[in-house]
C-alpha cells in the first residue's frame, strides 16, 4: 500500500477507548511521516478526543441526532467525507462503524466479530480486517491495525501531555488547599449503570478518609456528575473537586 497522506480513525465507543487510541495514532504519525489524521467519534467523547496529539479534525456521531432523524446524519457524513481518505481505520466491529470505514477510505481496516454470521460481508469488502478479542486489553486490540500495516510498535500507552496552562491551574488549586500528595477518586462514568452504588461508595470513602491521605474527588459539570457531587460526604480528608477541574487537568 502506498504511504497514506490522509488517515481517519473511527472510534464509536466510550472515553476510555478513545483515550487508548493515542498509541496507534502516535505510531501512524511517526511511521508515515506526519500524515493528516482525523477522528470520527461519538459526540460524548469529544472532550477526550481533543486531548489526543497529532489530530487535525474531529468529526462526531450523535445518537440523539440519530433518534431525531435516522438517516440525515449518515447522509451528511457520507456527502462530506466520501472516499476523502487514503486509509480508514475502524476500531470497533459494529455494522455502522464498518460502513463508515468502507465509505470514507480508499483502503480500509477494521475490527470484525469472530461470528462469521455477522462478519462475513465485512471481510469481503474491507481491505484488511482483524478479530476483536474481548479477552485482550483494549490497548492491544487498538494496536492490531499496526500489525496489518507491518508497522513495528511497543505495547505501551503513549500518555497525553497536558498543556502548561492546565498544569499551572491544577498546581494553583492544590496549593490553595495545601495538598501535595493525594489520591484521585473518580466516582462517575458516562452511563448510570456503570456507576458504583452510593452506599458502597460512601463506605469506601470513609475507609479511605481514615488513612489520613487527601482524597480529591473529580468529575465534570454534567448532570450525572453534578448529582454525585451533592451526594459526596464531608470529611476531613475529602476534597470535592467535581465540576472544578477540566479533563486536561487530570493528566
Question: Which residues does each PLM region occupy?
Answer:
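Catalytic machinery of carbohydrate-active enzymes
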Residues: 1-251
